[in-house]
Amino acid sequence: MADDNETVVSAPICTAAWLYILPKEQKLIEILTTLSLMEKRKSVVISPLLLNLTVENDFFPTVKTPIINYGGTVITKITSFMPVCFFFHGTDVFLKEAEDHGNLDKLCKQTREKFNLQEFVVNGNRKSVDIGKICESVGRNADDVLCHIVVGNGFKELLFAGLLIPCVEEQIQVQVGECLAIKIPLYSATLFESEETLCIDTCTEFIQENGFYAPQISEVLFYLIFTSWGMTLRFNNTLELIKAGLKQFIQDTEQTVKLAPNKTYHGIPGQKLSPIEKDHLMLVDAVITELTFSYTAEYLDSIYENNQIMNFSEWPIIKSAETHEEKIVELKKLRLHLSSHVAALVFAANSILYSNKLAYISNTKQAFNSAITQETLLRSIQFCNSLSSLNEDFYNDARKLIKCNSSPCKEDKFSAFHLAYACATCPQILSHIIWNLNRMSIYNTNCGNSEIYNHIVNCSSNLCEFCEGKCCHSCIGTALIRINSRLPQISKTTKKEPIVMTMFSRFYADVDVLGSFGKKGVNESKDPMKEAQTTPSLDRFKFLGMIHDYCKKNNLIDAITGEDNLNFKSQNDFVNMINDLIQCIEEAVSKCISEMRKTQTSREQIENCLQSFNIDTTPLSLAFSPFFVFTYYKVILIVLQNLALIIGTGYVVDRPCTGNLISKWLMQQYQSLYGAFYNSHFKKGFLNMKTVKIASNVDMEQYIDFNLFKSGKYAKTSIQAKLCRLSMQCLKDFRVKNRPFNKPNKNTQNNPFFKKVKQKKNPLSGCLSFLLFKYHERLFPNLKISCLEFWQRILLNNMPKTIDIGNVEDMRSFIKFTFRVTNSYDEIDLLDIQPECLLSFIEYYFHNKLLSVLGYRDYLTSLHALTSKLVPQNPMLFPVFLKEHPTFSSVQEYVMHVKKLVGNGLKEPMTASLTKEPNFGSIFTGRSIITFGLMIEKFVSVASRDYFHFGQLGWIAGSGVDRNLNPPSSGLQDFRFMRQKFVIATKLCDIIVKKVKREAIVYDVEVIRGKVLNIIESLSNSVNPELLILAEVMKDRDSKPTMDDMLFYVDGREPLAKSVMNKIQHLTDLNVHDFSLSTLLSVFEEQVEDSAAIYDFSELLVEGNEQGFGILKCEETEHENEEPSLKKARL
């Protein structure tokens, strides 16, 4: 949506490419080494564009750059700088510290041959730039400096082709962080030569002598930008893509066809399409590729301002660090945190890295020979995983089938070639991913750790195909074996799936249980006159606020932090506190329903509610990470193509192609297509744009005399600078949404995923679980057994009298209360989320009660976040920390070597792990980078017949992404995982079809977790459940688990996890290595005898249930002679 009000801004007139010369300062080198992308055998290092690190503090990210010289008038264009810079000289100081991952350059070359990608070829007719001569001309020794280039989006093709002219005479001395640097402008060759004479293959004599041609930079651009863009646009001729981009920026050819004559159409033979379907698919492909290429350039060459993230010196972790060493430690931690998102993009089968295929998924319910409409075509064409069709035969512009030159790829499993393909065969990107894979957790599948141990021993044979036995501890071969079970499967079927992407979140988020329902508008609350004239709207949060105020007044929660703050002296006090809180919640629900009647709020308003959040689409939002800049461009290209499908399908259906050449048809339609697309994606519910107007389009400037400079002289002259375009659209954000209510249709009305099933819950699995665990010792001060064992014995009516439970009658009342609340809550629980604190208990109870009273009975979908944290790991599973090629003759020798290293001070390696975030909304207030699945749905307005977009939050496919995303093991049959939608987040506020049957991968940790949760849920354990958990967890382990592992096993029950970990530590202190149940029972002597007399709580239990265990007979929450307080307020 474009803003109704234009924003007027100004931008300086200067070139859009600069050469920076920095001193080789050790601290700067160490920081850049941590933040940059590099490959040990490549001289170019890709670094982030950050103020006070790689550019000066007052660097302008957007400029009016001179592009054409007409005598005394210069035409300028707006362009913004790419969020990366390229170090190309003096980089040996970086590379000597780089991790060796084997010969990735060779692997990338083989991948290009295998999958028909173009190879970069150095232009032998061009002279490479003499950087030593440039350094000398500015008074610097080339051996003592680092050189890097920053370039605008519009200038990247000029830089690639060596069509930029450095002007040493205009050198500027600037302060970059703590370093004094020199920057030299690079002007477009179009200012000195006729634009018609410029070409990436040939050049004039002036350009040959003066042009800045650095083949190593051109090579990086070729793969990092152009090959990657071509893959996403399904355009394999990278050189033609570069030529088209150069022509578009210089000659303003946005409204002409540039790519279609050279476009080929891949992935079609394997789809078994009819001739008409095939034609429709290719035509739509051509349209959306061309439109996206034109509009991406326009949107990137627009006005963008510096953001907080771009200022390196203002990062909290940099400002708070007292020493340089602390800065490096914090930056390394940040890099590890971000590896969670790298993992998701690599391991998710529906990742943006693999979604390069346009597929025709026909609607089987469509009648035979029925006419194809725009709607049916729009539903049929989808973006999907391309790995299964990388070297199939393809079609050309004349729709002729061309045989593939390379041999067919018979690999059904994900390999190093697929990974290199996902990286656009850019060695620096591939090296970065390998660095992350070397530090990711292993997910075992029945073989324990033997696979990685055996591989390390086999490395001594020096037969590695990637490194030839030079660096097997860190090479790509070892990395892929470590995480082999987590790699995505290559499916032969095409299916509609969301696309997983990593972006930066906006602050706005409306993501509570019912989202937009009952949320009073900001404008409405500010305009009392307008409010008086209309029916007031419901303010749901007013009633939640009443409950929060009650809690603060009664000291149930901390008034500032919102943390639990229950202060009670006895079980009766606790019961009274919770009873009073529940009464307060139910009164608030009653008032809310009364308010709904007054405001005429219907059930439909609830059912149509939306949860939503915004994602930042500005190019500088991910400037801190060159890798995520790489994926950012892919996201923008995919999103624009998805939006262009509406226009493309409409034109293909209404104006069919009758000739042979697709490009000829497209040329006839393109100007109309171009204009139609401009109006089709504004204000349509998904993409938000900002209209920007430049303050002045004509400026008088003292500027370089270009004609004089061409003759070898330098002088400044007064010129008139005219901006070729005054108003433009800028990328702002897009909105991702979710519908909490499942609206059944003909296909889903019997869907079991949302049908509420009545459950008999153990209190430790109910709504009070967090309180029972947290306050166990305070509730039962004399009790010597754990919370879990206590409740298991209560359920079994097997509590020995040798255990001091205090006053028996108080205990009976407390047990009765606990079961009553647990079962009452379960009857109305439509969210199926276990509260983790009082605030979440209040929110869930309020909404469950509200929806239950209104007559809702099915489960809702819910939003959840997994946030990254760093946890220690077993160093034996991380051979990268050996620092040298392994030469071990046996597994035992390797194990002993690692133990020796640990004894000599080797710290446990830290890796990123994901943990459930209790407050989903906090990831947006915490300014997070998030990874999520997105599916852009299109629907037609009944009134206007216009198409609108709905950015649907989707799933992340792939069992290897993270263990928290996988469904429960077979022992726990529920569909909760089908109703929960997850995003992966790292908070930076403090840092900155026919189904193919195949066996699902089950990881060892999931099997253990399933058994542990069965122990917790089971009502028939005859011994302390904590000991059963301990025995299950420690079985077949060669080291103790981390706290993070234990929290995963017990589903986040922190007190229980701590208790089990304390027992493990106690056993470790006693030097116990046998973790069988008999040993555990002998060590923990406080176990009671089964023959001891027991307390009789049988009157609280009733027999005869199907499962064979007791069900508590709870008293009704309302007396029979009283009318429920909520009944009067029902709609």
From Swiss-Prot:
MF (Gene Ontology): single-stranded DNA binding
Pfam family, one: Viral_DNA_bp
Keyword DNA-binding: yes
Gene3D superfamilies to which the protein is assigned, alphabetical: Viral ssDNA binding protein, head domain
Signal peptide interval: none
Required for nuclear localization: annotated segments: 1112-1131
Annotated InterPro entries: DBP_sf, Viral_ssDBP_head, Viral_ssDNA-bd
Keyword annotations of the record: DNA replication, DNA-binding, Host nucleus
Subcellular location per the Swiss-Prot or TrEMBL entry: Host nucleus
Gene Ontology BP, a term: DNA replication
Protein's UniProt keywords contain DNA-binding: yes
GO cellular component, one term: host cell nucleus
Family matches, as SUPFAM superfamilies: Viral ssDNA binding protein (SSF118208)
Segments carrying motif Required for filament formation: 790-791
Its job: Single-stranded DNA-binding protein required for DNA replication. Plays several crucial roles in viral infection. Participates in the opening of the viral DNA origin to initiate replication by interacting with the origin-binding protein. May disrupt loops, hairpins and other secondary structures present on ssDNA to reduce and eliminate pausing of viral DNA polymerase at specific sites during elongation. Promotes viral DNA recombination by performing strand-transfer, characterized by the ability to transfer a DNA strand from a linear duplex to a complementary single-stranded DNA circle. Can also catalyze the renaturation of complementary single strands.
Family, as annotated: Belongs to the herpesviridae major DNA-binding protein family.
Oligomer status and interactors: Homooligomers. Forms double-helical filaments necessary for the formation of replication compartments within the host nucleus. Interacts with the origin-binding protein. Interacts with the helicase primase complex; this interaction stimulates primer synthesis activity of the helicase-primase complex. Interacts with the DNA polymerase. Interacts with the alkaline exonuclease; this interaction increases its nuclease processivity.
Descriptive protein name: Major DNA-binding protein
Organism: Human herpesvirus 7 (strain JI)
Organism placement in taxonomy: Viruses, Duplodnaviria, Heunggongvirae, Peploviricota, Herviviricetes
